[in-house]
């Protein structure tokens, strides 16, 4: 199977090349990708190259593919898997294969025929053996790509835990009908977290408070969930969850003001031995020491802080109130990615329409723009970047479609479609793009790329 793929040769050195992939053979699967969404972890891997723990040391001579938030269509199925997958079936992929002895060798870093920024991938048998190729029954490919970042949030909701006073029995997950705070929560992952908090078929809070320090981000987030932002805040209800968006930038005492949201119904508000107004569950989306300390002060009795932000500083330190750890049962957790169940549930919930991951997307482009868009992650503000792997298209902000549409009817039509959908990407926009954008042409392959073989028998 011929493919055009971005391949990583070193730090900030990726090349768009035509290659030949293996056929499915007896036990492989070949998938034609349709979409990939770019993750901040892609930026870390591409920027660091072999300096990243997950990237092999020999990529200069044996390059890997990058990108891991994918969706596509099965094109070839080996005899071993014909009872489980069929040609033409839509699928997603769990990138954390979790192969014993090879735990750090995840999709998007360590594999030569599996990545996101490519037209096709070859999946060796181990991918299916680990349960990481997942059927998808949704209506749009881009939603399946977003199942991977959504699964990280689902994992976060399941990583939090609580226990009753004087009890060793732990209740895993957020507090059902509790109070939740998202600090710096209007980025792409924060928006996904809001969606899950309001629409998850599992536990949901009764009250959700979302902070940021940028009015534009807050206004966009509020609009996506049907609220009008003005005067530094927006208040409303989403699917039975009380939701508040608030700008903390000008607050003289953010801890006091954020606790005020809970004082209306906090049974511990007048208890001098407790922290009245504190939150049951806090998710922090920025690795900033001052915010970590604020979160410490904002936890309620038995509260759980999920340090969701992945830091780059290996020596990150912050003040944390350990008096309250001892007496008020405060605790901290973190998670990096989800497992197969988190991913399978995310794919299922998106396919059934429970979740609306389109709120995360701010930019759309083609395969030709994928590498530059990855390198520009920290330079250009916005949420998720969506790549259609079989088209050529500059990475473009949805909010810029109208301006580009003045000279290009292609963007004018995309603007019309998205404007009719609250400014969000949607299935109609995807269908139009796939039918009208310039197609990627795959040339003569420079080499046949074979994947290394890892078997479960070697565990």
Residue ranges and their predicted role:
Residues 77, 149, 184-187:
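Glycine-rich Rossmann-fold phosphate-binding loop(s) that bind the pyrophosphate
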Residues 164, 252-255, 264-271, 277, ...:
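C-terminal hydrophobic helical "lid"/dimerization subdomain
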Residues 177-178, 183-186, 194, 198-291:
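Adenosine-nucleotide cofactor-binding segment
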């Amino acid at each position: 199977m011929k493919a055009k793929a971005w391949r990583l040769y070193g730090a900030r050195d990726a090349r768009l090349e035509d290659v030949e992939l293996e056929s499915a053979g007896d036990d492989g699967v070949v998938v034609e990708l349709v979409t990939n969404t770019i993750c901040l972890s892609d930026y870390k891997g591409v920027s660091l190259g072999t300096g990243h723990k997950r990237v092999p040391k020999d990529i200069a001579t044996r390059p890997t593919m990058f990108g891991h938030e994918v969706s596509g269509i099965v094109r070839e199925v080996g005899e071993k898997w014909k009872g489980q997958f069929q040609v033409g079936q839509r699928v997603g992929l769990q990138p954390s294969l979790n192969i014993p002895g090879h735990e750090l060798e995840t999709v998007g870093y360590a594999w030569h025929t599996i990545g996101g920024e490519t037209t096709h991938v070859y999946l060796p048998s181990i991918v299916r053996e680990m349960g990481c190729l997942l059927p998808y029954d949704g209506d749009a490919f881009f939603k399946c790509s977003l199942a991977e970042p959504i699964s990280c949030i689902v994992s976060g909701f399941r990583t939090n835990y609580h226990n009753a006073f004087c009890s060793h029995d732990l209740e895993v997950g957020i507090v059902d009908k509790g109070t939740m705070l998202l600090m710096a929560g209007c980025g792409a992952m924060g928006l996904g977290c809001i969606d899950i908090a309001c629409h998850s078929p599992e536990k949901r809070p009764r009250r959700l408070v979302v902070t940021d320090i940028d009015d534009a981000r807050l206004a966009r987030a509020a609009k996506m969930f049907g609220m009008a932002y003005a005067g530094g805040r927006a208040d409303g209800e989403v699917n039975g969850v009380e939701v508040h968006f608030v700008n903390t930038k000008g607050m003289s005492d953010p801890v006091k003001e954020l606790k005020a949201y809970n004082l209306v119904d906090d049974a511990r508000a007048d208890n001098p031995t407790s922290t009245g107004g504190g939150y049951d569950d806090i998710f922090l989306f920025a690795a900033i020491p001052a915010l970590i300390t604020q979160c410490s002060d904002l936890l309620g009795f038995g509260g759980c802080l999920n340090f969701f932000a992945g830091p780059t500083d290996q020596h990150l330190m912050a003040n944390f109130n350990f008096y309250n750890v001892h007496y008020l049962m405060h605790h901290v957790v973190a998670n990096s990615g989800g497992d197969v169940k988190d991913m399978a549930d995310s794919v299922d919930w998106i396919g059934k329409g429970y979740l609306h991951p389109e709120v995360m997307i701010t930019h759309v482009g083609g395969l030709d723009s994928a590498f530059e868009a990855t390198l520009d992650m920290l330079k250009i503000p916005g949420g998720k970047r969506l790549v259609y792997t079989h088209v050529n298209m500059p990475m473009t902000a949805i909010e810029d479609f109208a301006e580009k549409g003045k000279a290009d009817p292609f963007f004018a039509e995309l603007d019309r479609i998205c404007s009719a959908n609250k400014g969000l990407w949607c299935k109609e926009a995807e269908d139009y793009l796939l039918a009208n954008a310039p197609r990627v042409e795959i040339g003569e392959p420079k080499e046949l790329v074979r994947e290394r073989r890892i078997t479960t028998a070697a565990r």
